[in-house]
Regions:
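Short aromatic-cysteine micro-motif
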Residues: 22-57, 85-151
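Mature N-terminal segment immediately following signal peptide/propeptide cleavage
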Residues: 1-13
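Acidic/histidine-rich helix-loop elements
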Residues: 12-25
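An exposed tryptophan-centered "aromatic clamp" motif
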Residues: 150-158
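Acidic helix-start/capping segments at beta-turn-to-alpha-helix junctions
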Residues: 58-81
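Short, flexible active-site-adjacent loop segments at beta-strand->alpha-helix junctions, enriched
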Residues: 10, 17, 43, 64-66, ...
Length: 158
């Protein structure tokens, strides 16, 4: 895992009312000061997360619960009606058996996407991984600061 340093800075975190989704609780925007920190230059991959699972026998939250939310376009159209969705966010479908190594449900696999970012990882799962990998999970503020790429816009590209 490679880390890159980010300098201290001030940025606007969150969105104005009417932007995004109220359920995300990201409004109103607030100015945040961030001290210098380091962040991984890529997200954790399926391969890296599998190494953690293999080494520890850890069971993820999605595996324990037995389901997780999948973006609707990753589910076969004829199966979409079978699954529950998030009120106000119909693009998320609650799929039984979806978890980190079965990203779109029990028939799916990560075999061909080992270098893709791991998905269906809860905060608890991420903290367990970071403890095992001896790295620090960025805070929400650090993550948003890094994701915005030093801009004041909603997205790094504008």
């Amino acid at each position: 895992m490679n880390f890159v340093p980010l300098k201290s800075g001030i940025f606007q975190m969150g969105y104005s009312l009417g932007q995004g989704f109220i359920e995300d609780h990201e409004a109103p925007p607030v100015m945040k000061k961030v001290l210098a920190f380091e962040i991984a230059d890529t997200t954790v991959t399926n391969r890296e997360f599998k190494a953690f699972i293999d080494a520890t026998g850890y069971t993820t939250t999605a595996e324990t619960i037995g389901d997780s939310y999948v973006f609707h376009l990753f589910v076969e159209p004829e199966k979409r009606a079978e699954y529950g969705h998030v009120s106000g966010s119909p693009w998320w479908l609650l799929v039984p058996g979806a978890c980190w190594n079965h990203p779109t449900g029990p028939e799916s696999s990560i075999d061909d996407v080992m270098d893709h970012p791991v998905v269906h990882v809860s905060l608890q799962d991420a903290l367990a991984y970071c403890d095992w990998a001896k790295v620090k999970l960025p805070t929400e503020t650090q993550w948003e600061y890094a994701a915005r790429g030093g801009t004041t816009t909603q997205f790094p590209w504008g």
